[in-house]
């Protein structure tokens, strides 16, 4: 599931990279992103860093913005800033690229975000202590959840996000999904090549994760449903 810069040569279009990735939860090193930038100087490279605050120091591509006119880094308030309902985000790029974006914006939609979302976003940026405590708590619970899955024989990728991407050791992922759903526990499964054997598990509170593991232990021991 790792990012290979060679795959992004000569595409002839703008390039969008989710880093950390969803749904795999993996983080590509900034050196790999920089290699893509250098190989595509005439293409805009958009790096979606929705989950980067859960990845630790040095994960963001923001420091590269000053060196690359074709780099646009986008962020959201929906994850680490706890404002999913506000539909709020921002982007960072060099002045010329931002000016181009504004021209496109004003050509079809001159309206900005609503006042309540703007106020909530400003308040979230000011409360750095709450942000850091929240991220630290999620990362701590993530580590415990990953250990719990590995103890049960699951393959768990090293997550840089607020979720885990894991493969069950015995039963098909789709069956585990349905068994958990019967127990009113919801996770995600993507019926697509390469990842249909994997499950995406969001990190909740410690109590919520215990509820997940209780249901999982039942689900893994349940007889397959008749078809």
Give residue ranges: language-model regions.
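PLP-dependent enzyme catalytic core of the Aspartate aminotransferase-like
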Residues: 31, 178-183, 187-188, 192-227
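Short beta-strand-to-loop capping motifs
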Residues: 93, 166-170, 203-205
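Active-site pre-lysine segment of PLP-dependent enzymes
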Residues: 2-11, 23-45, 49-83, 95
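Short acidic/glycine-enriched loop/turn segments that link adjacent beta-strands
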Residues: 85, 160, 194-197
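Structural motif
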Residues: 14-18, 46, 90-92
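PLP-dependent aminotransferase class I/II
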Residues: 70-150, 154-157
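Conserved PLP-binding catalytic core of the aspartate aminotransferase-like
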Residues: 138-139, 151-183, 199
């Amino acid at each position: 599931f790792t990012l290979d810069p060679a795959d992004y040569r000569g595409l002839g279009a703008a390039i969008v990279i989710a880093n950390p990735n969803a749904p795999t939860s993996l983080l590509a090193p900034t050196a790999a992103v920089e290699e893509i930038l250098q190989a595509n100087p005439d293409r805009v490279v958009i790096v979606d860093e929705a989950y980067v605050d859960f990845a630790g120091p040095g994960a963001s591509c923001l420091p590269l913005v000053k060196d690359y006119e074709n780099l646009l880094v986008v962020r959201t308030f929906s994850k680490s800033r706890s404002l999913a309902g506000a539909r709020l985000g921002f982007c960072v790029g060099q002045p010329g690229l931002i000016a181009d974006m504004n021209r496109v914006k004003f050509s079809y939609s001159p309206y900005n975000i609503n006042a309540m979302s703007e106020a909530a976003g400003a308040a979230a940026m000011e409360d750095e202590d709450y942000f850091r405590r929240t991220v630290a708590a999620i990362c701590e619970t993530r580590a415990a959840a990953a250990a719990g899955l590995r103890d049960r024989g699951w393959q768990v990728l090293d997550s840089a996000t607020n979720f885990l991407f894991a493969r069950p050791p015995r039963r098909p992922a789709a069956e585990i999904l349905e068994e958990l759903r019967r127990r009113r526990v919801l996770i995600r499964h993507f019926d697509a090549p390469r990842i249909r054997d994997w499950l995406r598990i969001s990190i909740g509170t410690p109590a919520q994760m215990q509820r997940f593991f209780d249901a999982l232990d039942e689900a893994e021991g349940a007889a397959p449903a008749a078809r």
